[in-house]
Amino acid sequence: MTPIEIKNQDILGILNKAEWFIDNHKLLEDHLHLNGSNVDYTKWVSEEYKTKVIEEGQAHEGYPVTATGFSIKPEQIKYKKFNEEIPKMYDEINQELMVYFGARHNALFHVYPPNGFLSWHNNANASSYNLIFTYNPTGDGYFAYHDWETNRTKKMYDKVGWSCKYGYFGNYKDAREKLVYHCAQTNVWRMTISYIYNAYDTDIGKEFQQQVINEIMSE
């Protein structure tokens, strides 16, 4: 995964609107079901579990087995009692970002509570180029992935505020090194928004992706 520095003030302006979900986490707690509540994250982000998932080979479908957090996407959100502000804010922010990035699909819009996590997995079921934005108010969280070159886990620690990373998540038809086994964990409220581009994009499509990345890094 490649870190992308966010310098574009227009993009930051849209992302800053999304901080509403962190600022209003009590609203989420009151109205939404928390996925993976009372799950101890330590097992699911451990080296032992990572090894188990890798050794499963293609028996691992690609999905994370478990995670803790609030899924905000309309097809994933689970209400305890409906609140119109939550989908309204999602629609507004998602639409602006999709237009800006020329993306067709919002893959993830997820809010993690303290001690929230995403278990080791590889997304082989949804191979694509991923543009991933993470907000952490204190930086006390991380994204970890298996580095095939060193055969070790590498952690990309969150920055205070917004950060971005970009990379290709491979499938089982690709070389092993294209499989990105990864997990995430946080000790504070944290959110991740991601958009995907076609894994089999044309040269023109890949050039467009690079233009998007350049735009994110432009002042």
State where each predicted segment sits.
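Anionic coordination/interaction segments
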Residues: 1-16, 20-23, 27-42, 203
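A residue-level signal for beta-strand positions that form part of recognition/binding surfaces
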Residues: 3, 106, 190
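Catalytic core of non-heme Fe(II) oxygenases with the double-stranded beta-helix
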Residues: 102-175
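Catalytic core of Fe(II)/2-oxoglutarate
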Residues: 144-219
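Carbohydrate-recognition beta-sandwich/jelly-roll modules
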Residues: 7-14, 18, 76, 81-82, ...
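Signature of the catalytic double-stranded beta-helix
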Residues: 31, 35-116, 122
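Compositionally biased, intrinsically disordered low-complexity segments
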Residues: 7-9, 25, 42, 56, ...
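Hydrophobic, Leu/Ile/Phe/Ala-enriched alpha-helical segments that form helix-helix packing faces
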Residues: 18-26, 89-101, 184, 197, ...
